[in-house]
Curated annotation (Swiss-Prot):
Binds 1 [4Fe-4S] cluster per subunit. Keywords: 4Fe-4S, Amino-acid biosynthesis, Branched-chain amino acid biosynthesis, Iron, Iron-sulfur, Leucine biosynthesis, Lyase, Metal-binding. The lineage of its organism: Bacteria, Pseudomonadati, Planctomycetota, Planctomycetia, Pirellulales. Belongs to the aconitase/IPM isomerase family. LeuC type 1 subfamily. The gene is leuC. Its cofactor is [4Fe-4S] cluster. This is 3-isopropylmalate dehydratase large subunit. It comes from the Bacteria. SUPFAM superfamilies: Aconitase iron-sulfur domain (SSF53732). GO terms for biological process: L-leucine biosynthetic process.
Length: 485
């Protein structure tokens, strides 16, 4: 893949006909437009298709039934991630459905000539971790996957979004997709984030501000000094959770931080400097108009903790569990009361008095090396509470290897944390890593829906540092006051 153009106007078969100032979305859309009818969806070219074991079996079977090949196998990569066990991989996969899905992915990739990073490959991992770390994800691309959190890749200035199984088949067969062009929504965060406030806190705060439907029909573009100051891994955390605000995708324009991250990665263009010159043209033009814009101050953001059953039910760690009566909206009152009942919380309880018994540090939101370093910095010199079962799951085999080379795994295991193999793990209840009914978990994942981590389990979304501190104390604490050793 290293010689393929990531901006792909020639692959898309169309060039921009637009004039005037354009947004990042406008530029990528125009470059990938194959056909734009006067009414109905457009046909856009897809640069990169990411595949995993859960949403691909029916798609490959559809190709087989209709005697169709994969149109561009070299633009398709696959890995098992959702169902893989994160403990002893020398043993057979116990769950028959999980085992069958992984075996089917192997068979399909072999038959259709698709690159597979299997369980025994160091490049295996969560699909939204391995794409960027290997250089497959590049600015200006259109990227799809049969997974909600494909928006992660928008951190590189790409248009990346999740698709359904029938669309997976369509992309496999044609390397194109029928899409209506979304509207644009700028979320600008100016200033600086305070000490102890992370990218995870930023995106949770923004979702809390606009709500879980605030981005519906839009692609979010994150701008402002506070966003520009984020590392690439932090930007991935922000874009990852765009879907939790109801958005189609999330994007951050590429800059020198992006280029420095990508340089030297195996699947980047052979003429990297030429690619950078093309990528520099992607950011939104001065004066470009968004359909909607909101402005926030980075200094207003504090460490966040979700208290309810969707990511928008969130507050700062130094506040209290809200009451249904805090809102005059009847629907909000009902949803708050329902969430408090499921979460077994009382209104007015300080967030720092909420006790937890499970901790999960991992997922496509927060399982990269910087996330693990942040957790290790908190954990060093401390020990996990006797009341807490804590696990740390790297996002890929490469992340695991690097963490072990840096000695992070020793910090974790010496403190009583469980160190695992790469995979989606406890982000979702599709593998052996699950919450039992009534267990309360501080999790670095992206969804806190009822039963998301296991039937009857209760999930609080936080940053890696906040999760690590909760594991040590047995309850939530304000990481800004932490005793680093």
């Amino acid at each position: 893949m290293s010689d393929a153009s990531s901006t792909a106007p020639s692959q898309a078969g169309a060039t921009s006909q637009s004039t005037g100032s354009r947004t990042l979305l406008d530029k990528i859309w125009d470059q990938h437009l194959v056909h734009a009818p006067e009414s109905g969806p457009a046909i856009i070219y897809i640069d990169l298709h990411l595949v995993h074991e859960v949403t691909s079996p029916q798609a490959f079977e559809g190709l087989r039934i209709n005697n169709r090949p994969v149109r561009r196998p070299e633009r398709t990569i696959a890995t098992p991630d959702h169902n893989v066990p994160t403990s002893d991989r020398s043993l057979p996969i116990a769950d028959p459905i999980s085992r069958k899905q992984i075996e089917t992915l192997r068979e399909n990739c072999k038959e259709f000539g698709v690159q597979l990073f299997d369980i025994d490959d160091v490049r295996q991992g969560i699909v939204h971790v391995i794409g960027p770390e290997n250089g497959y994800t590049q600015p200006g691309m259109t990227i799809v996957c049969g997974d909600s959190h494909t928006a992660t890749h928008g951190a590189f200035g790409s248009l990346a979004f999740g698709i359904g199984t029938s669309e997976v088949e369509h992309v496999l067969a044609t390397q194109t997709l029928l899409q209506f062009k979304p509207k644009t929504f700028e979320l600008r965060v100016d200033g600086e984030l305070a000490r102890g406030v992370t990218a995870k806190d930023m995106i949770l705060y923004l979702i809390g501000q606009i709500g879980t439907a605030g981005g519906t029909g839009y692609v979010l573009e994150f701008t402002g000094d506070a966003v520009r100051n984020l590392t690439m891994e932090e930007r991935m955390t922000v874009c990852n959770m765009s879907i939790e605000a109801g958005a189609r995708a999330g994007m951050i324009a590429p800059d020198q931080t992006t280029f420095d991250y990508l340089r030297g990665r195996p699947e980047c263009p052979a003429d990297f400097d030429a690619a950078v010159e093309a990528w520099k043209k992607l950011p939104s033009d001065p004066g470009a108009t968004y359909d909607r814009s909101n402005l926030y101050k980075g200094s207003d953001i504090r460490p966040q903790v979700t208290w309810g059953t969707n990511p928008g039910q969130v507050c700062s760690v130094d506040s209290v569990v809200p009451s249904p009566g805090d809102s005059t909206d009847v629907n909000v009152q009902k949803s708050t009361a329902s969430a408090l009942q499921y979460m077994d919380l009382k209104a007015g309880t300080p967030i720092t008095e909420i006790e937890i018994n499970r901790v999960f540090i991992g997922s496509c939101t927060n399982a990269r090396i910087e996330d693990l370093r942040a957790a290790a910095a908190v954990i060093k010199g401390h020990h996990c509470s006797d009341k807490v079962n804590a696990m740390i799951v790297p996002g890929s085999g490469k992340v695991k290897l690097q963490a072990e080379e840096e000695g992070l795994h020793k910090v974790f295991t010496d403190a009583g944390f469980d160190w695992r193999e790469a995979g989606c793990s406890m982000c979702l209840a599709m593998n052996p890593d699950k919450l039992a009914p009534g267990e309360r978990c501080a999790s670095t994942s992206n969804r806190n829906f009822e039963g998301r981590q296991g039937k009857g389990g209760r999930t609080h979304l936080v940053s890696p540092a906040m999760a690590a501190a909760a594991a040590i104390k047995g309850h939530f604490v304000d990481i800004r006051d932490w005793d680093y050793r």
